[in-house]
Protein backbone atom coordinates (compact mmCIF):
# COMPACT_ATOMS: atom_id res chain seq x y z
CA UNK A 1 0.00 0.00 0.00
CA UNK A 2 1.40 3.38 -0.97
CA UNK A 3 1.85 6.26 1.41
CA UNK A 4 -0.77 8.28 -0.46
CA UNK A 5 -3.70 6.04 0.47
CA UNK A 6 -6.04 7.90 2.82
CA UNK A 7 -4.54 11.30 2.02
CA UNK A 8 -7.49 12.32 -0.16
CA UNK A 9 -10.80 13.86 0.91
CA UNK A 10 -12.10 10.51 2.19
CA UNK A 11 -9.23 10.37 4.68
CA UNK A 12 -10.08 13.73 6.21
CA UNK A 13 -12.33 11.96 8.71
CA UNK A 14 -10.74 9.56 11.17
CA UNK A 15 -13.08 6.75 10.13
CA UNK A 16 -12.27 7.22 6.45
CA UNK A 17 -8.55 7.36 7.13
CA UNK A 18 -8.44 4.21 9.30
CA UNK A 19 -10.72 2.27 6.95
CA UNK A 20 -8.56 3.19 3.96
CA UNK A 21 -5.32 2.25 5.69
CA UNK A 22 -6.32 -0.75 7.83
CA UNK A 23 -9.82 -1.81 6.84
CA UNK A 24 -13.31 -1.83 8.32
CA UNK A 25 -12.55 -4.52 10.93
CA UNK A 26 -9.93 -2.38 12.68
CA UNK A 27 -12.25 0.62 12.51
CA UNK A 28 -15.25 -1.22 13.97
CA UNK A 29 -13.54 -3.40 16.57
CA UNK A 30 -10.87 -1.04 17.84
CA UNK A 31 -11.02 2.59 16.75
CA UNK A 32 -14.77 3.25 16.93
CA UNK A 33 -15.22 1.94 20.53
CA UNK A 34 -12.16 3.82 21.78
CA UNK A 35 -13.09 7.08 20.08
CA UNK A 36 -16.70 6.83 21.29
CA UNK A 37 -15.51 6.31 24.86
CA UNK A 38 -12.87 9.03 24.92
CA UNK A 39 -14.24 11.71 22.57
CA UNK A 40 -17.98 10.95 22.93
CA UNK A 41 -18.26 11.07 19.15
CA UNK A 42 -18.15 8.81 16.12
CA UNK A 43 -14.90 8.77 14.12
CA UNK A 44 -16.94 9.35 10.95
CA UNK A 45 -17.52 12.98 12.01
CA UNK A 46 -14.10 13.75 13.49
CA UNK A 47 -11.31 15.38 11.50
CA UNK A 48 -8.20 13.21 11.45
CA UNK A 49 -5.93 16.24 11.60
CA UNK A 50 -7.73 17.53 14.71
CA UNK A 51 -7.89 14.28 16.67
CA UNK A 52 -4.38 13.17 15.65
CA UNK A 53 -2.44 16.18 14.34
CA UNK A 54 0.37 15.17 12.01
CA UNK A 55 -0.61 11.49 11.81
CA UNK A 56 -1.56 11.59 8.13
CA UNK A 57 1.70 13.31 7.21
CA UNK A 58 3.69 10.79 9.27
CA UNK A 59 1.83 7.92 7.61
CA UNK A 60 2.72 9.26 4.18
CA UNK A 61 6.36 9.66 5.24
CA UNK A 62 6.68 6.15 6.72
CA UNK A 63 4.42 4.49 4.15
CA UNK A 64 2.32 2.79 6.84
CA UNK A 65 -0.17 3.83 9.51
CA UNK A 66 1.13 1.08 11.79
CA UNK A 67 4.69 2.35 11.33
CA UNK A 68 3.65 5.93 12.05
CA UNK A 69 1.87 4.87 15.25
CA UNK A 70 4.86 2.73 16.28
CA UNK A 71 7.19 5.71 15.88
CA UNK A 72 4.89 7.84 18.05
CA UNK A 73 4.67 5.17 20.73
CA UNK A 74 8.43 4.71 20.76
CA UNK A 75 8.96 8.45 21.16
CA UNK A 76 6.34 8.67 23.91
CA UNK A 77 7.73 5.63 25.73
CA UNK A 78 10.88 7.49 26.71
CA UNK A 79 8.95 10.15 28.62
CA UNK A 80 5.73 8.57 29.89
CA UNK A 81 4.37 5.40 31.46
CA UNK A 82 0.83 4.04 31.77
CA UNK A 83 0.78 5.47 35.30
CA UNK A 84 1.86 8.99 34.28
CA UNK A 85 0.03 11.52 36.44
CA UNK A 86 0.46 14.59 38.60
CA UNK A 87 0.93 13.38 42.16
CA UNK A 88 -1.63 15.12 44.34
CA UNK A 89 -4.00 16.06 41.51
CA UNK A 90 -4.08 18.54 38.64
CA UNK A 91 -4.38 21.50 41.01
CA UNK A 92 -0.73 20.87 41.96
CA UNK A 93 0.26 21.69 38.38
CA UNK A 94 -1.86 24.84 38.40
CA UNK A 95 -0.28 25.98 41.67
CA UNK A 96 3.20 25.31 40.26
CA UNK A 97 2.47 27.34 37.11
CA UNK A 98 1.10 30.21 39.19
CA UNK A 99 4.20 30.18 41.41
CA UNK A 100 6.52 30.15 38.38
CA UNK A 101 4.73 33.11 36.79
CA UNK A 102 4.84 35.14 40.00
CA UNK A 103 8.51 34.28 40.54
CA UNK A 104 9.20 35.67 37.07
CA UNK A 105 7.46 38.93 37.99
CA UNK A 106 4.03 38.19 36.56
CA UNK A 107 0.59 38.52 38.14
CA UNK A 108 -2.09 35.83 38.14
CA UNK A 109 -5.70 36.88 38.74
CA UNK A 110 -7.86 33.95 39.81
CA UNK A 111 -11.66 33.89 39.69
CA UNK A 112 -11.35 36.69 37.13
CA UNK A 113 -12.88 36.75 33.67
CA UNK A 114 -12.47 38.81 30.50
CA UNK A 115 -15.67 40.78 29.92
CA UNK A 116 -14.70 42.60 26.71
CA UNK A 117 -11.81 43.23 24.29
CA UNK A 118 -10.85 46.21 22.14
CA UNK A 119 -7.84 47.49 20.22
CA UNK A 120 -5.57 49.94 22.03
CA UNK A 121 -2.95 52.35 20.72
CA UNK A 122 -0.20 49.91 21.66
CA UNK A 123 -1.88 46.54 21.82
CA UNK A 124 -5.11 45.34 23.38
CA UNK A 125 -7.35 46.38 26.26
CA UNK A 126 -9.30 43.78 28.21
CA UNK A 127 -12.02 44.59 30.68
CA UNK A 128 -11.51 42.05 33.47
CA UNK A 129 -13.54 41.45 36.58
CA UNK A 130 -14.55 38.94 39.25
CA UNK A 131 -16.60 35.91 38.27
CA UNK A 132 -18.49 33.06 39.88
CA UNK A 133 -18.93 29.52 38.53
CA UNK A 134 -21.44 28.84 35.78
CA UNK A 135 -24.18 26.19 36.03
CA UNK A 136 -21.81 23.34 35.10
CA UNK A 137 -18.00 22.93 35.28
CA UNK A 138 -17.76 23.33 31.51
CA UNK A 139 -19.86 26.50 31.32
CA UNK A 140 -18.44 30.01 31.11
CA UNK A 141 -18.02 31.75 34.49
CA UNK A 142 -20.62 34.41 35.29
CA UNK A 143 -19.61 38.06 35.99
CA UNK A 144 -19.87 38.83 39.70
CA UNK A 145 -18.70 42.44 40.01
CA UNK A 146 -17.43 45.53 38.18
CA UNK A 147 -14.51 45.22 35.78
CA UNK A 148 -11.24 47.07 35.36
CA UNK A 149 -9.25 47.71 32.18
CA UNK A 150 -5.94 45.96 31.55
CA UNK A 151 -3.84 46.95 28.52
CA UNK A 152 -1.15 44.68 27.08
CA UNK A 153 1.05 44.56 23.99
CA UNK A 154 0.60 40.81 23.58
CA UNK A 155 -2.47 38.70 24.26
CA UNK A 156 -3.13 34.95 24.12
CA UNK A 157 -6.79 33.97 24.15
CA UNK A 158 -6.42 30.58 25.84
CA UNK A 159 -10.04 29.90 26.62
CA UNK A 160 -13.14 28.17 25.35
CA UNK A 161 -14.46 28.80 21.86
CA UNK A 162 -17.52 30.66 23.16
CA UNK A 163 -15.38 33.05 25.24
CA UNK A 164 -12.82 33.66 22.48
CA UNK A 165 -15.46 34.25 19.80
CA UNK A 166 -17.40 36.57 22.11
CA UNK A 167 -14.30 38.69 22.75
CA UNK A 168 -13.28 38.81 19.08
CA UNK A 169 -16.80 39.82 18.04
CA UNK A 170 -16.95 42.56 20.69
CA UNK A 171 -13.63 43.96 19.46
CA UNK A 172 -15.29 45.01 16.17
CA UNK A 173 -12.08 44.66 14.18
CA UNK A 174 -12.51 45.61 10.49
CA UNK A 175 -12.24 42.58 8.25
CA UNK A 176 -12.44 40.09 11.12
CA UNK A 177 -15.49 37.86 10.82
CA UNK A 178 -15.42 35.01 13.39
CA UNK A 179 -17.40 32.57 11.22
CA UNK A 180 -16.96 29.58 13.51
CA UNK A 181 -19.89 27.69 14.95
CA UNK A 182 -18.85 25.03 17.45
CA UNK A 183 -20.89 21.82 17.10
CA UNK A 184 -22.94 20.83 20.12
CA UNK A 185 -21.19 18.28 22.29
CA UNK A 186 -22.77 15.41 24.14
CA UNK A 187 -24.21 15.75 27.65
CA UNK A 188 -21.56 14.10 29.81
CA UNK A 189 -21.88 12.99 33.43
CA UNK A 190 -19.11 11.52 35.57
CA UNK A 191 -19.92 9.81 38.83
CA UNK A 192 -17.03 9.04 41.18
CA UNK A 193 -17.69 6.60 44.01
CA UNK A 194 -15.53 5.80 47.02
CA UNK A 195 -16.36 2.23 48.00
CA UNK A 196 -15.20 -0.22 50.64
CA UNK A 197 -14.74 -3.37 48.56
CA UNK A 198 -11.92 -5.84 49.32
CA UNK A 199 -12.99 -7.73 46.17
CA UNK A 200 -11.53 -4.87 44.11
CA UNK A 201 -8.05 -5.16 45.66
CA UNK A 202 -6.94 -7.37 42.76
CA UNK A 203 -8.12 -4.77 40.17
CA UNK A 204 -10.34 -7.07 38.07
CA UNK A 205 -10.40 -4.62 35.14
CA UNK A 206 -6.93 -3.13 35.73
CA UNK A 207 -7.08 0.67 35.21
CA UNK A 208 -10.53 0.50 33.63
CA UNK A 209 -12.36 -0.18 30.40
CA UNK A 210 -14.44 1.37 27.64
CA UNK A 211 -17.89 0.17 26.57
CA UNK A 212 -18.47 -0.04 22.82
CA UNK A 213 -21.46 1.96 21.55
CA UNK A 214 -24.66 0.04 20.83
CA UNK A 215 -28.40 0.75 20.51
CA UNK A 216 -29.86 1.70 23.88
CA UNK A 217 -31.95 -1.47 24.16
CA UNK A 218 -28.90 -3.67 23.49
CA UNK A 219 -26.43 -2.17 25.96
CA UNK A 220 -25.33 -4.33 28.88
CA UNK A 221 -24.70 -1.18 30.95
CA UNK A 222 -25.62 2.50 30.81
CA UNK A 223 -22.03 3.64 31.45
CA UNK A 224 -19.68 4.22 28.52
CA UNK A 225 -16.51 3.88 30.60
CA UNK A 226 -15.24 2.81 34.01
CA UNK A 227 -11.95 3.96 35.53
CA UNK A 228 -10.39 2.37 38.62
CA UNK A 229 -8.74 5.60 39.71
CA UNK A 230 -6.49 4.36 42.51
CA UNK A 231 -5.07 1.81 40.06
CA UNK A 232 -4.80 4.34 37.23
CA UNK A 233 -3.19 6.94 39.52
CA UNK A 234 -1.13 5.03 42.13
CA UNK A 235 -0.58 8.04 44.40
CA UNK A 236 -4.29 7.90 45.25
CA UNK A 237 -3.92 4.44 46.77
CA UNK A 238 -1.66 5.90 49.46
CA UNK A 239 -4.41 8.34 50.47
CA UNK A 240 -7.13 5.72 50.97
CA UNK A 241 -7.96 3.41 53.88
CA UNK A 242 -7.40 -0.33 53.34
CA UNK A 243 -9.78 -1.97 50.84
CA UNK A 244 -11.20 1.42 49.78
CA UNK A 245 -11.34 2.17 46.07
CA UNK A 246 -12.27 5.09 43.82
CA UNK A 247 -14.33 4.18 40.77
CA UNK A 248 -15.35 6.72 38.13
CA UNK A 249 -18.17 5.93 35.72
CA UNK A 250 -18.76 8.06 32.63
CA UNK A 251 -22.18 8.50 31.03
CA UNK A 252 -23.54 10.28 27.96
CA UNK A 253 -23.31 9.76 24.22
CA UNK A 254 -23.68 12.15 21.31
CA UNK A 255 -27.27 12.66 20.17
CA UNK A 256 -28.80 11.34 23.38
CA UNK A 257 -30.58 13.09 26.25
CA UNK A 258 -28.79 14.14 29.42
CA UNK A 259 -28.11 10.92 31.30
CA UNK A 260 -29.98 10.24 34.53
CA UNK A 261 -27.35 8.91 36.93
CA UNK A 262 -28.19 7.09 40.15
CA UNK A 263 -26.12 5.26 42.75
CA UNK A 264 -28.14 2.06 42.30
CA UNK A 265 -27.69 2.19 38.53
CA UNK A 266 -23.95 2.80 38.91
CA UNK A 267 -23.58 -0.16 41.26
CA UNK A 268 -25.38 -2.38 38.74
CA UNK A 269 -22.99 -1.20 36.03
CA UNK A 270 -20.00 -1.93 38.28
CA UNK A 271 -21.29 -5.45 38.95
CA UNK A 272 -21.72 -6.13 35.24
CA UNK A 273 -18.34 -4.68 34.25
CA UNK A 274 -16.20 -6.06 37.09
CA UNK A 275 -18.13 -9.03 38.45
CA UNK A 276 -18.01 -7.46 41.91
CA UNK A 277 -21.22 -6.79 43.84
CA UNK A 278 -21.05 -3.67 46.01
CA UNK A 279 -23.81 -2.89 48.49
CA UNK A 280 -25.16 0.65 48.72
CA UNK A 281 -23.96 0.93 52.32
CA UNK A 282 -20.39 0.22 51.12
CA UNK A 283 -20.39 3.55 49.23
CA UNK A 284 -18.56 5.93 51.56
CA UNK A 285 -18.57 9.03 49.33
CA UNK A 286 -19.70 10.20 45.91
CA UNK A 287 -19.29 13.10 43.48
CA UNK A 288 -21.34 13.76 40.34
CA UNK A 289 -20.01 16.28 37.80
CA UNK A 290 -21.64 17.22 34.50
CA UNK A 291 -19.54 18.44 31.59
CA UNK A 292 -22.27 19.12 29.05
CA UNK A 293 -21.03 20.16 25.62
CA UNK A 294 -17.32 20.17 26.50
CA UNK A 295 -16.37 17.54 23.89
CA UNK A 296 -17.96 18.71 20.63
CA UNK A 297 -17.34 16.59 17.52
CA UNK A 298 -14.99 18.60 15.28
CA UNK A 299 -15.46 17.63 11.60
CA UNK A 300 -13.11 18.59 8.73
CA UNK A 301 -15.24 21.58 7.69
CA UNK A 302 -15.00 22.97 11.23
CA UNK A 303 -11.22 22.67 11.11
CA UNK A 304 -11.21 24.62 7.84
CA UNK A 305 -13.24 27.46 9.41
CA UNK A 306 -10.91 27.62 12.41
CA UNK A 307 -7.86 27.79 10.15
CA UNK A 308 -9.53 30.63 8.23
CA UNK A 309 -10.13 32.49 11.50
CA UNK A 310 -6.49 32.02 12.52
CA UNK A 311 -5.43 33.49 9.17
CA UNK A 312 -7.64 36.54 9.84
CA UNK A 313 -6.23 37.00 13.35
CA UNK A 314 -2.54 36.53 12.50
CA UNK A 315 -2.03 39.87 10.64
CA UNK A 316 -3.53 41.82 13.55
CA UNK A 317 -0.34 41.36 15.53
CA UNK A 318 -0.01 40.86 19.25
CA UNK A 319 -2.79 38.30 19.62
CA UNK A 320 -2.97 34.51 19.35
CA UNK A 321 -5.69 31.91 19.78
CA UNK A 322 -5.31 28.55 21.45
CA UNK A 323 -7.31 25.90 23.27
CA UNK A 324 -8.86 22.57 22.37
CA UNK A 325 -11.33 24.22 19.99
CA UNK A 326 -8.37 25.41 17.87
CA UNK A 327 -5.65 22.83 18.53
CA UNK A 328 -7.74 19.69 18.91
CA UNK A 329 -8.66 17.67 21.98
CA UNK A 330 -5.88 16.48 24.27
CA UNK A 331 -3.27 18.10 26.49
CA UNK A 332 -0.42 17.25 24.11
CA UNK A 333 -2.15 18.96 21.17
CA UNK A 334 -3.04 22.06 23.17
CA UNK A 335 0.39 22.47 24.78
CA UNK A 336 2.19 22.20 21.44
CA UNK A 337 -0.21 24.65 19.79
CA UNK A 338 -0.12 27.12 22.70
CA UNK A 339 3.68 27.17 22.80
CA UNK A 340 3.86 27.87 19.08
CA UNK A 341 1.29 30.65 19.37
CA UNK A 342 3.03 32.33 22.30
CA UNK A 343 6.43 32.04 20.61
CA UNK A 344 4.99 33.77 17.55
CA UNK A 345 4.19 36.84 19.66
CA UNK A 346 7.76 37.32 20.92
Q: What are these model-derived regions, one by one?
A:
Residues 2-115:
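Active-site/ligand-binding neighborhood in enzyme catalytic cores
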Residues 108-110, 157, 321:
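A structural signal for the hydrophobic beta-strands that form the central parallel beta-sheet
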Residues 115-132, 136-260:
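Mid-domain catalytic core of redox enzymes
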Residues 226-346:
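Conserved flavin/dinucleotide-binding core of flavoenzymes
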Residues 90, 94, 164, 259-267:
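Generic alpha-helical secondary structure
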Residues 101-107, 121, 315-318:
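A short helix-to-beta-strand connector/capping loop
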Residues 22-31, 176-181, 276-285:
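Short, surface-exposed acidic
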Amino acid sequence: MGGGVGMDEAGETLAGFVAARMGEAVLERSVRPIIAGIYTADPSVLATDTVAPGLRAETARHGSLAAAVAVRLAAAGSRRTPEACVQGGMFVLVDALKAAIEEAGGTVLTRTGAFSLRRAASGWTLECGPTKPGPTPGAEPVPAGPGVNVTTERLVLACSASAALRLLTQARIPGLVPDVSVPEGAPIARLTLAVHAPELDDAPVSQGLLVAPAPADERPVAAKALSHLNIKWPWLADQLPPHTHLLRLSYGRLGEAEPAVTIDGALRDIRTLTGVTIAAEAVTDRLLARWNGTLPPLPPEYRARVRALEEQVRPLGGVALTGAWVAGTGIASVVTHARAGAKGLL
